[in-house]
Amino acid sequence: MVSEAPPFWWRKPDWRAWGLSPFSFLYGRVAGHRMVHGRRASVPVPVICVGNFTVGGAGKTPTALALARAAKTKGLKPGFLSRGYGGSLDVTTVVDPHDHHATAVGDEPLLLAREALTVIARRRADGAERLVREGADLIIMDDGFQSAQLAIDYALVVIDATRGIGNGHLVPGGPVRAPLRTQLGYTSGLLKVGDGNAADRIVRLAARAGKPFFSASIKTLGQEDLQGRKVLAFAGIADPTKFFRTVETLGAGIAVRRSFGDHEHLEEDEIADILDVADRDGLEIVTTSKDYVRLIGHHGRADELLARCRVIEIAMVFDDPHAPELIIDRAIAAARERRLREGWTGKTLLPSGEK
């Protein structure tokens, strides 16, 4: 999978997108075939997948966290399943946020593990089985929508209202991961995040396909005292400009911006540059939670940078506060039907309100 999205993916199709069309066609054939014909392992608990149609960030991790919090209020024990992208471990592992570092397990699993039981696995079926053994009664997959490795009971596809699906072309000519018709066929619900009209076309397509639609926004937690402060902001996420806009909405003036690749671990000279520029210009340093956890256990002056960083924590807030519970209930109901079809025996979870 492409890890860095070139800027032309997010603009109107140009000669590069059209020139790469033959390769996009081949990529789409393979990705679509995998989604349709992949052998999906089945586990005896409900599985919710939080995915997106495109390469890059759309808010999957904060969405997964919001669902886990809702699950816990219902008395469930959710468990996160992640591939551990950016980490070096290639064995199925229960993530310990106190002992593991991002270099081993990836940055997103560390954030997830602060909230609930988290397992990383190269084979998602292995990870799901481990979560069940560890006592999870609801699995929330952070990404993996196109992988076709695990039977999914509810696929919530997250789409950024300001970016949509970019130029609409498949990889490598655009950011789309598999043919949209195929992806929509496996979509249970769509979540539009933020304001903007870039996602309107795909929302209409989903509506015509009878898919339920939810909306949400990303809210910052605290940091109101940044109003009027001059800061150096750095981010190594899929869309750093989104983070910079968030900092500006808090009233801070960004004097210096530093953008890095998604999941990128900073080199010693990059850490030193951030600290030296902030010292020279008298700036506070702000960053994302993902960038912060990647610095833990780092070398050189990383501890100094950790001590000086102000982390902008965010949360996904659904417009309808009951939406997460509704999604969980639908996943539970779908899992019950799947278990009956497949002949599972034992305790069956029921949506809230049923006995």
Curated annotation (Swiss-Prot):
Q: Which GO terms describe its cellular component?
A: plasma membrane
GO molecular-function terms, A-Z: ATP binding; tetraacyldisaccharide 4'-kinase activity
Specify whether Oxidoreductase is a keyword of the entry. Answer: no
Residues engaged in binding ATP = T54, V55, G56, G57, A58, G59, K60, T61
List the catalytic activities from the record.
Answer: a lipid A disaccharide + ATP = a lipid IVA + ADP + H(+)
Q: Which GO terms describe its biological process?
A: lipid A biosynthetic process; lipopolysaccharide core region biosynthetic process
Give EC number(s), comma-separated.
2.7.1.130
* Keywords from the UniProt entry: ATP-binding, Kinase, Lipid A biosynthesis, Lipid biosynthesis, Lipid metabolism, Nucleotide-binding, Transferase
Q: Does the keyword ATP-binding apply?
A: yes
Q: Which Pfam families match?
A: LpxK (PF02606)
Please give the pathway this protein is involved in. Answer: Glycolipid biosynthesis; lipid IV(A) biosynthesis; lipid IV(A) from (3R)-3-hydroxytetradecanoyl-[acyl-carrier-protein] and UDP-N-acetyl-alpha-D-glucosamine: step 6/6
Top-rank EC class of the record's enzyme: transferase
**Role:** Transfers the gamma-phosphate of ATP to the 4'-position of a tetraacyldisaccharide 1-phosphate intermediate (termed DS-1-P) to form tetraacyldisaccharide 1,4'-bis-phosphate (lipid IVA).
Q: Sorted alphabetically, which NCBIfam families does this protein's record hold? A: lpxK (TIGR00682)
Which family is this protein grouped under?
A: Belongs to the LpxK family.
**Mind telling me which HAMAP family this protein's record contains?**
LpxK (MF_00409)
What's the protein called, per UniProt? Answer: Tetraacyldisaccharide 4'-kinase
Q: Which organism is it from?
A: Rhizobium rhizogenes (strain K84 / ATCC BAA-868) (Agrobacterium radiobacter)
What would be the name of the gene that encodes this protein? lpxK
